Amino acid sequence: MLHFLIRPSTRCAGSPHFNSTSSFLRKRLQSKTILSKRLGFQFRPSSTNVLAEVSTATSGFNPSWWPYALIQNTAYTINVYAGAPWWVSIILTTLGVRLALTPVMIASFRNSTKLSVIQPEMKKELEAIKTAKLDNDQLALNQHSIALRGIYLKHNVNPFAIFILPLTQSAVFFSFFYAIRKMSRLSVDGFTTGGLAWFKDLSIPDPYCILPIINAGLMFSGMQMNRANTASTIGNSTNWRTFFFLCCLLSPLLTAKLPAAIFMYWIPSSLFNIVQGYILKNPVVRSKLGFAPLPSIIEKQPSGFTLITNPIKSLKEFYKGVRDGFKTQYEQLQKDVSRRAVATTSASTIRPNSHYKKLKELNRSKKNSKKQSN
């Protein structure tokens, strides 16, 4: 009944890595030994073997507060205390972290939807600020900057808050990636047999490349769901949709050599995004969370559909769109630089020279008047 804490292992003792979790388990096992002597029976056949199992099971773990170490220790704790296989431990750790990040996600989505609503007002003021900078008009620049800050305060939004969620998710992704990759390379107890179905060994890649393909499809679905929920201008552009689809299409080729354990994080995380997207599409949920309502017209054709039916034409259009976009930006940049140069020259050169000429003419007229008076 009480022997589920540690599973048997065939490895020997003496691992150099022994963290605080292991010392805690050692104390628990010592107390069990004393209790078994008093009761007259043993909880385990041999406490020495159990201690060896604790030592070898923690190979590669560190008592650190870095995010990757916390992820490793959390998954290990679930594996040891619940007796769950490693694929279940990684999935439960993933879901726990994603649930912990839910408040950050809600705050970021609320801010993004408010920004999408006030985008016309923001665009007007930003264009005015840009024009004032090019014309070197400090008065207009200050006026429109104050007006833009007033819009942010009126609607209670922060334009920099949209970066919090992507940065947090990136940090979590790289922490999981590093933690699981390190676990797959080290001799962690039960990792080579802690898989499921055709991927029993979590430390090696999927031999049939099924997990990378499933992950690519779920990533694409999650991107579609988030694009529809935020309804942002960038996410709905044709070029960006094609680019995202190409990334998902090529991801199985780029992730085929990754250990199968990484997909025990990636696939549940993508499923979490899809479920989260379906929940956030509900108008009642959006109103309760303070989200702006979705636009009435959302493109129903899924992005990438044209790429599948006619890939050559779609790739040509994608290349043409990217090229035209860079060309337009370059031409606009040249115009802005020229306009800025003219404004700076007129402010620093033309006005002082004209003023100097007026002073010179005034002094000359004074001298002429003195000569005439004499």
Curated annotation (Swiss-Prot):
Q: Which GO terms describe its biological process?
A: protein insertion into mitochondrial inner membrane from matrix
UniProt main location, coarse: mitochondrion
Organism superkingdom: Eukaryota
Keywords on this record? Membrane, Mitochondrion, Mitochondrion inner membrane, Transit peptide, Transmembrane, Transmembrane helix
Topological domain, Mitochondrial intermembrane: which ranges? 98-159, 264-374
| Cellular localisation | Mitochondrion inner membrane
For the Mitochondrial matrix compartment, the record's topological domain ranges are 181-242
Tell me the GO molecular function terms: membrane insertase activity
GO CC term, one of those recorded: mitochondrial inner membrane
Topology relative to the membrane = Multi-pass membrane protein
Family recorded in the similarity comment: Belongs to the OXA1/ALB3/YidC family.
| Cited function | Required for the insertion of integral membrane proteins into the mitochondrial inner membrane. Essential for the activity and assembly of cytochrome c oxidase. Not essential for viability, while oxa102 is essential. When both genes are deleted the cell is non-viable, suggesting that oxa101 act as a back-up for oxa102.
Name of this protein: Mitochondrial inner membrane protein oxa1-1
Q: Which species is listed as the source?
A: Schizosaccharomyces pombe (strain 972 / ATCC 24843) (Fission yeast)
Q: What is the lineage of its organism?
A: Eukaryota, Fungi, Dikarya, Ascomycota, Taphrinomycotina
